[in-house]
Amino acid sequence: MTARNLFLLPGDGIGPEAMGEVRKIIAYMNEAMNAGFVTDEGLVGGCAYDAHGAAISEADMQKALAADAVLFGAVGGPKWDSVPYEVRPEAGLLRLRKDLQLFANLRPAICYPALAAASSLKPELVEGLDILIIRELTGGVYFGEPKEIIDLGNGQKRGIDTQVYDTYEIERIAGVAFEMARTRQNRVCSMEKRNVMKSGVLWNQVVTETHKAKYSDVQLEHMLADAGGMQLVRQPKQFDVIVTDNLFGDMLSDVAAMLTGSLGMLPSASLGAPDGKTGKRKALYEPVHGSAPDIAGKGIANPIAMIASFAMCLRYSFNLVKEADDLEKAIANVLDKGIRTGDIMADGARQVGTVEMGDAILAEFKTLSA
């Protein structure tokens, strides 16, 4: 069978500990399922700066470009707060996104039933919540030009950012949203501000045209982004897939994440365009949480977000849908049994460390996949 090439970038802080639990799952899948994963590993972030003077080396960048998928841990920490801006730890992630041309950011907001009480909303509003927010990652106001602060010469300054979207950028992110919806509940809600922004008018038009041309089997709804934020808090389970631009996606995905009550448990994926010959997309998978340097090396970090990111990798990079389903179910089963790391501890639960949580999830995964 064809090898499945994974490039692991554990990074800083708790990244290596969390990645260690994914390695166990990869080893089991290779042994028991003949999965054919071939792994290589590199440095990114502060540890890469310490070793190479850059947030990611050129050699590791080439390995990332050659891999079928990249698994990324976390970067940063106080140790590197004073390094030059262009080689700060976060620059490694930005370089990966840029060079891999990752334009679609997928952020699931999943509320495991066992953790519904941890949400700031009533449990009945969020229990069983499963939203996928798809954010355009390489266009919009974060990248548009001009972007500057100018001196007006009268004691005043003017800050300028430019919101820019071209048709092709909207078409391709809409295509990802419709394709993902087909594998879920077949519903997409597109969010923009067409009432006050010309880019929002174009966004609405292009999403509508793309839907009509290729995806008319998917249910499409349009919503103003501010109303969408309100509805996410009012009645979140009305949504399946939400697609939006870079700025609104940045905000709405964090709002949706907090509905779950467990920001540190959520995965994400960033996808590129399909290859013209193979149809495969470049992809990077990472937990939403940061490097948590205060608990690094203590063996208490929660590995669930990293494991759930690997489940997304199985689903979107390798089309191993059953295996992805089983791994996500294994996480839910472990939580149902009252097994918790300290960050999600609850009355009556049993507190465990990183390795024990990883072992418990692997044991459930073995049972489900037997």
Curated annotation (Swiss-Prot):
Q: Where does substrate bind?
A: R97, R107, R135, D226
Q: According to the UniProt entry, what is the EC number of this protein?
A: 1.1.1.85
Task: Write one Pfam family the protein is assigned to.
Answer: Iso_dh
Site positions (Important for catalysis) are Y142, K193
Q: Which GO terms describe its cellular component?
A: cytosol
The Gene Ontology biological process terms listed for this entry are:
L-leucine biosynthetic process
Q: What cofactor does this protein call for?
A: Mg(2+); Mn(2+)
Locate the residues binding Mg(2+).
Answer: D226, D250, D254
Molecular function as annotated in GO: 3-isopropylmalate dehydrogenase activity; magnesium ion binding; NAD binding
Coarsely, its chief localization is cytoplasm
Which transformation does this protein catalyse, written as a reaction?
A: (2R,3S)-3-isopropylmalate + NAD(+) = 4-methyl-2-oxopentanoate + CO2 + NADH
PROSITE patterns membership? IDH_IMDH
Q: Which superkingdom, per the lineage?
A: Bacteria
**Record carries keyword Magnesium:** yes
**Keyword line:** Amino-acid biosynthesis, Branched-chain amino acid biosynthesis, Cytoplasm, Leucine biosynthesis, Magnesium, Manganese, Metal-binding, NAD, Oxidoreductase
Q: How does it assemble?
A: Homodimer.
Record's NCBIfam families? leuB
Q: Which family does it belong to?
A: Belongs to the isocitrate and isopropylmalate dehydrogenases family. LeuB type 1 subfamily.
> PANTHER family recorded for this chain?
3-ISOPROPYLMALATE DEHYDROGENASE (PTHR42979:SF1)
Summarizing the function annotation, the protein's role is: Catalyzes the oxidation of 3-carboxy-2-hydroxy-4-methylpentanoate (3-isopropylmalate) to 3-carboxy-4-methyl-2-oxopentanoate. The product decarboxylates to 4-methyl-2 oxopentanoate.
HAMAP family recorded for this chain? LeuB_type1 (MF_01033)
This chain belongs to which protein, by name?
A: 3-isopropylmalate dehydrogenase
From which lineage does this chain's organism come? Bacteria, Pseudomonadati, Pseudomonadota, Alphaproteobacteria, Hyphomicrobiales
